Structure formats: structure tokens, C-alpha cells
Amino acid sequence: MPHGTLYDPIRKKDVPATPEEHVRQATIQFLLNEVKVPAHLIAVEFGLCAIDSKTDGRVDILVHNFRDGAALDKPWLLVECKAPGEYTWQALQAQLNRYLKLLRPKYVMLALGDAVRYFALDGVSLRFKPIESLPEYK
């Protein structure tokens, strides 16, 4: 492996080893190995233009919900990753709120360095409520 890069098993290529990329790759390994998400359902740096052609920006990680027949805008999981010290939880939440104008995921994961927060969509209130961890993908 060349110095200064990490191998991304989803994009199947080496990527620059930035602090944020370290968080992203650790999150991908967590999703694959602990949550048991099939690799083919994971999208890295998912372009929001796939949902709305007038929208730019990218979601760090999206886990599609195709098994349940869900549309592209209703993923199983939306993940935002940031290197420690780059963002506050409030700034990360504000960025996430912009994505939630287009996407309605079942779960949300915020990874700020080693600190992680999880949320689940409440089907009645349509609000995200904190949860202890993600369920295993089924």
C-alpha cells in the first residue's frame, strides 16, 4: 500500500489517508463486520444529485434499503463522518439536517472521530430519537 493512502473496500481503490478518511474507513469496517451490512448495499460519498439533480453535496456513507423495496431516498442508514476536532456535534447535526430534506433513512449514525451517536426514525412522529446502537442488518 503506498504511503499516505488507505484502501477503500467499497470503492475498491486507494484513497488519501486524511483524518476524516480514517474515520470513514473505520466506520465501513464496523458496518461490514459488526452490523453485517452486505458490501454491495454500501455507497461511499453518495452524490445527492442522484436524488435531486439540482442538489449538490455528498453523504459520507449510505446503506441502501433495496431489500425492503425502498426507494433511493429511503435508505436503511445515513452516516456522516468527521475527523476529531473538525466539527462540533451541533455543526454535524446542521449538516445532517440539510441531507434530511432529501433523504428519509431508517437510521442515522454520526461519527465524530471515535465518538459515535446513533438515531432511529420514529414512524409516528417522524423524528429521530437517540438509540444505544445500530441493530444488525437483516
Language-model segments: residues:
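A short, conserved, highly charged catalytic patch centered on acidic carboxylates
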Residues: 1-107, 113-138
